[in-house]
Amino acid sequence: MEVLDKAVNGYIDHLLGPKDPRVKGWLLLDNYVPTIFFTALYLFIVWRGPKYMQNRQPVSCRSILVVYNLGLTLLSFYMFYELVTGVWEGGYNFFCQDTHSGGDADTKIIRVLWWYYFSKLIEFMDTFFFILRKNNHQITVLHVYHHASMLNIWWFVMNWVPCGHSFFGATLNSFIHVLMYSYYGLSAIPAIRPYLWWKKYITQCQLTQFVLTMTQTTCAMIWPCKFPMGWLYFQNSYMISLIILFTNFYLKTYNKKTSSRRKEYQNGSASAVNGYTNSFSSLEDNVKQRKQRQN
């Protein structure tokens, strides 16, 4: 393992240059191998999990989901608040901000962005809950691509550009996740589920987030500072991929609804957001079928 660590990190350092010394020794950041391992394990579970559950009953995760989504809602709010106050304290420039001129605010933002990176590892649980509940239709290309890529991208961000212009996308995303995970948590409560009307607008907010992030990134290209230009090009490329995938999801979900899907909405079931469905209809239908067979 040590030989692998040296080989992988030596190649990355040669390709990207020296890492930011301010994050040296931080959990999971010194070596890329743990991040690769967690991603590979995630993809393996995505592949094997549905097959493992194929002949098993879905697991009810209702209580766990409420707690899990509440926790991520609070963590997202904490990150959003700390990033906004850190940017204000450091006098960050919206158009372009380098990684070394914010003083103590840079240190604060680096600390918060580490939590943002770590939250992407926690969010792998989203997919695992789908597998346990046998909601395999929710494990889409968009869902897996977004989850697997974000953890890896933010490992690189934290090691080379852990503050400065990197703040904007994480700030917007943290705010969106406050809305998104609060929706997930509430939709896990049957009494509240019929009153949730804002699922469609969360996806619209996500698309708006990507466009705004591209706009802010492009500003740094037009009015450059000392923030590395290569990271800006990569950021915009990644945003384009998300816009394409999320737009495709949005059109399929909201503009081409099947009659069965419309019936589900009329019956008050919670529908998909970002490839997620928080209804427990599949589990409940399974229980009903078992009872009918027993009778």
From Swiss-Prot:
Pathway: Lipid metabolism; polyunsaturated fatty acid biosynthesis. GO terms for biological process: fatty acid elongation, monounsaturated fatty acid; fatty acid elongation, polyunsaturated fatty acid; fatty acid elongation, saturated fatty acid; long-chain fatty-acyl-CoA biosynthetic process; sphingolipid biosynthetic process; unsaturated fatty acid biosynthetic process; very long-chain fatty acid biosynthetic process. It is found in: Endoplasmic reticulum membrane; Cell projection, Dendrite. It catalyses: a very-long-chain acyl-CoA + malonyl-CoA + H(+) = a very-long-chain 3-oxoacyl-CoA + CO2 + CoA; (6Z,9Z,12Z)-octadecatrienoyl-CoA + malonyl-CoA + H(+) = (8Z,11Z,14Z)-3-oxoeicosatrienoyl-CoA + CO2 + CoA; (9Z,12Z,15Z)-octadecatrienoyl-CoA + malonyl-CoA + H(+) = (11Z,14Z,17Z)-3-oxoeicosatrienoyl-CoA + CO2 + CoA; (9Z)-hexadecenoyl-CoA + malonyl-CoA + H(+) = 3-oxo-(11Z)-octadecenoyl-CoA + CO2 + CoA. The chain crosses the membrane at residues 26-46, 64-84, 112-132, 150-170, 172-192, 207-223, 227-247. Residues 266-284 have a biased composition (Polar residues). GO terms for molecular function: fatty acid elongase activity. Keywords: Cell projection, Endoplasmic reticulum, Fatty acid biosynthesis, Fatty acid metabolism, Lipid biosynthesis, Lipid metabolism, Membrane, Transferase, Transmembrane, Transmembrane helix. Disulfide bonds: none annotated. It is a multi-pass membrane protein. Pfam families: ELO. Its main location: endoplasmic reticulum. Its EC number is 2.3.1.199. It comes from the Eukaryota. Catalyzes the first and rate-limiting reaction of the four reactions that constitute the long-chain fatty acids elongation cycle. This endoplasmic reticulum-bound enzymatic process allows the addition of 2 carbons to the chain of long- and very long-chain fatty acids (VLCFAs) per cycle. Condensing enzyme that acts specifically toward polyunsaturated acyl-CoA with the higher activity toward C18:3(n-6) acyl-CoA. Belongs to the ELO family. ELOVL5 subfamily. This is Very long chain fatty acid elongase 5. It comes from Xenopus laevis (African clawed frog). The gene is elovl5.
